[in-house]
Amino acid sequence: MSLYLNASILVALFVIDPSSSRAEAFLSAHPEIVVVSDFGVAEFSSAVGRRVRTGDLTREDGQLAFCNFDNGSHDLHTGRRSRLPISTQQLGFLRRLDINLRTADAIHIAISRRLGAALVTFDRSMAAGARALGVAVATP
């Protein structure tokens, strides 16, 4: 089964973060194909930008995170990664009134479901929603 990474994992992989070692250890232990969606890249970019604007990261560190992501300085880039364009065609479960889903979470879950991939996230709420919808979840 492939692994679909959401932004919480991407940030931990490319920015020094309290979760970085867990994310790196998880990927090292799982040789599966890694999928990153364009939506995940957008969320990653937004999160890095927010950290720069709030002073949690220097501008240089933010630019380095983008450069490293784009140029492949992580195991994520050893041919295991696949990029996926955004598709929101399978978001009907947003109308389920029994599951609390944020829009961004629903998009990540829909992409994972479409791929038949395990959703890899640190976000407990997203993980719970995915499980409720029958999507496999891996939490490092």
What name fits each language-model region?
Residues 5, 36, 81, 103-106, ...:
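Short beta-strand scaffold positions
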Residues 3, 21, 59-61, 78, ...:
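Hydrophobic/basic alpha-helical segments enriched in Actinobacteria
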Residues 2, 37, 88, 109-140:
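Acidic, PIN/NYN-like endoribonuclease modules and their adjacent C-terminal/linker elements
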